[in-house]
Structures are given as structure tokens and as C-alpha cells.
Amino acid sequence: VLPPAGSIPIQQQQVRERSLVPLEPLFSLEPQQLLQRSDSVELQFDWPRSADDPRELSEIPELRLWSLRADALCPWLPLLLERSSGQLTRHVAMLLPHSFSRSEGIRFAPDSLELWMTHRLFLLDHWSRGHGLNCRGNLEQMAAVLGFELDGSFWNGLS
């Protein structure tokens, strides 16, 4: 069972071992149940840092490696991550090259974002449709949050 409010604590040892045990409650959910959790899951990394460590979480190699593994084995995870607090953006920052500025926030390398986002759109659309579900609206919202402009004809010709 997931903790209340969709918060998933990820302990330091689990990160070091690249253990996905914290995500296991999601593995048993049917696709429809997963989609019902869209925009509601928060990953809470318990990763101690000294007060003078200026790095963002996405700059910590161990957290990036854990996130890469989670993304590879749970390709639907970005759909579930909460968007308004930056959970989705932080997760994608763990996966893709990016820069950060105080005025603009995270800016993804455009080619990397386009490749990852297009791949993820195809993958999750196929996955959801294979289960008789449609999550295109949700995928479009996810893309918009990441600053990826989806052409209106993107879905044309895809069954």
C-alpha cells in the first residue's frame, strides 16, 4: 500500500543499492489504477547533504542512477509524478542533460527533451491503448509541463 498523499520515501540505502522496493506497491496496480494516480505521486529522497553542498538533487550521481533505473523499469512513472511542485521536472532532470538558471529554472537540452518526450509519448500511448485506455490528454499535459510543444497533428495516423 502506498503511503498517504502519494508520497513515496526512498531511503539512502535503497538509492545506493538501486533498489526499487519503494515503488513495488505500484507494480501490482492495473494500468487503469496507475492512470488514476496521474499527477499525484511524490518521490521523497532521503539523501543527506552538507549545508555547503550547492548541488541540485539531479546533480547527485547516485540519485541519477536510481532514477534512470526507475525510469527504465517503470516507464509510466513520469505520468504518475506530481507536476505543480516540480516532481515531474526533477525526475526528467535526473534523466536528461539540462541547465539551471535562477530566472528560468530548469532548461532541458532541446534535442534530448524532444527525443525522450517523443519516445515516451509513443511508448505510453501504445501501453495505454493496449489496455483499452486513452491517456493522450494526460500525456499532452505532461509534455506541456516540461516545455515540450506538441504539434496538434502529433497523434494523426496513430491507432
Stretches with model-predicted labels:
Residues 64-70:
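Short, structured motif recognition centered on aromatic/hydrophobic residues
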